[in-house]
Every structure is written in structure tokens, then in C-alpha cells.
Amino acid sequence: MSVKVEKKTDSYLKDTIQKLLERSRESGSVFWRDIAIRLSSSRKNYATVNLGKLQRIASDDDIIVIPGYLLSSGVFNKKIKVSAFKISEKALKKLNDAGSEFVNLVDLASENPKGTNIKIIR
């Protein structure tokens, strides 16, 4: 399956996909390639996750990747590390108030090149 980056018009998205593919090739991990493939698909297929869903699914100290958008609906009070393509301002504020951490996808790929102990939420 090829990754069609050239069809994307958003430069931030193109850059993110290319950097995730580079990390995947460098580390030999298919995890970051899978995230890049999900981001290279149509936007209607992106994951849209609310904080309320993370509250139900995640445990404290989990590392969560969302190949799409993180929105602020719901109550949230867990201490986790979250990474997503985009996050709303309210969701970021709720995460910080709960003591959680938001990390860019590319930065998380640099921290954890193999993608071990990371959950993908859709």
C-alpha cells in the first residue's frame, strides 16, 4: 500500500506524514507507518475523539495516539500522554488542567521510535 502524500494540500499534514514515514524507515517500525497511512487517507476517515471517550478507555500513565482530531466534549481527569494530528484549544486546556501532557505526533515518534506501549484510539 503506497502513501499518497503528494495529493494533500495542507503543508503541515504533508510534513507530518513524511516525517512519520522517515521515523518508520529509520527504526524499522510499522507502527508509525500505520499512523502515516491513516493520515494520508481521506479526512472523513480521520478519527475524531472526545475527551470523554479517553476518560472511559485510558488508564493513568497510558500513551495514546489519535490519528485525527481530539475534541473537548466530556469530563476528563486522568494523567496520560496524548498525541494527535490536531487538538482543539478547549481540549488542550482540559488536558493541562488534569495534569496530562499533549505531544506532537512527530515529537512522540522521536521519543518512541518503535512505538512500544502506545495505544491507538479511533
Curated annotation (Swiss-Prot):
UniProt lists the family membership as follows: Belongs to the eukaryotic ribosomal protein eL18 family.
Note the InterPro entries from the entry: Ribosomal_eL18 (IPR000039), Ribosomal_eL18/eL18-A/B/_CS (IPR021132), Ribosomal_eL18_arc (IPR022947), Ribosomal_uL15/eL18 (IPR021131), Ribosomal_uL15/eL18_sf (IPR036227)
Q: Which UniProt keywords apply?
A: Ribonucleoprotein, Ribosomal protein
User: What's the protein here called?
Assistant: Large ribosomal subunit protein eL18
* Any one cellular-component term (Gene Ontology): cytosolic large ribosomal subunit
Molecular function GO terms recorded: RNA binding; structural constituent of ribosome
Q: What Pfam families would the database entry show?
A: Ribosomal_L18
Q: Which GO terms describe its biological process?
A: translation
